[in-house]
Amino acid sequence: MIDTSAIRGKLTPNRDLSELTWLRVGGPADWLFQPADIDDLQTFLRMLPADIAVFPMGVGSNLIVRDGGLRAVVIRLGRGFNAIDVAGDTVTAGAAALDAHVARKAADAGVDLTFLRTIPGSIGGAVRMNAGCYGSYTADVFRSAQVVLRSGELATLGAAELNFRYRQSDLPEGAVLVSASLQGVPGDPEALHARMQAQLDKRDQTQPTKERSAGSTFRNPAGFSSTGRADDTHELKAWKVIDEAGMRGARLGGAQMSEMHSNFLINTGGATAADLEGLGEEVRKKVYDTSGITLEWEIMRVGDPLDG
């Protein structure tokens, strides 16, 4: 058991995670903790036995939780972690602040973080995964992050400590990112909002935004962002090699590779995590067999299968 006497947040045992992920699949976590604020999170992690695993979870936009669930304490940040403050060209956002909200508030203040507007998820996830699109990455604008380490200690990490790479960073194991400071370049608010609207229009025309998906399924083999630069003509894209392998529209159970954009894995209704991950693995095998390219997952998969 976990001692709850000193915490103010909500601790829920055996919490089903399927309703917390965009794909609406997954089994239960041993525990779900929703801290009230940073002090509460620090208190909880200090008293949590060291042998209990911690999994920080954002809004579940880039995540498959396997059907057997997660043997860990899942930490999900809420309202106490979604403030957005702008000072000059620097935007400091709580880890639970949505990327789209940060982009809009920055634009209101004449700060260009427009690439965040079409990225699903929260700032915590954007930093952890070095999220990006249209040739811009979180690492390009990142200045520092506040994290609560697994020990409960509050620390400030810079870009050197996080060692950003394509869709990766070195956030310490068990650490929970609580806020990040990003520095954009000045811009005209009206022009920034117009650019974001154009990006949204393009996304809606090319991606299955009305389906249950988790964004891009696989990293691009070239290491570029999944949508590429607006003027990028590089041929080696994940969607292209998936198409060449004949896997656009492929199905397994309730899972499907989108007909609209073949690098989007969607839950058409009633899919299990096993369906989704299984179809993804079929795609990886077929792409390797036809092109010799090994696709790497961009969607994070965690937890245990139902039978194990």
UniProtKB/Swiss-Prot annotation:
Enzymatic class: oxidoreductase
One term under GO cellular component: cytosol
Essential cofactor(s): FAD
GO annotation, biological process: cell division; cell wall organization; peptidoglycan biosynthetic process; regulation of cell shape
Magnesium listed as a keyword: no
Main location: cytoplasm
E.C. designation(s): 1.3.1.98
MF terms in GO: FAD binding; UDP-N-acetylmuramate dehydrogenase activity
Catalytic activity: UDP-N-acetyl-alpha-D-muramate + NADP(+) = UDP-N-acetyl-3-O-(1-carboxyvinyl)-alpha-D-glucosamine + NADPH + H(+)
Protein name: UDP-N-acetylenolpyruvoylglucosamine reductase
Source organism: Ruegeria pomeroyi (strain ATCC 700808 / DSM 15171 / DSS-3)
Gene that produces this protein: murB
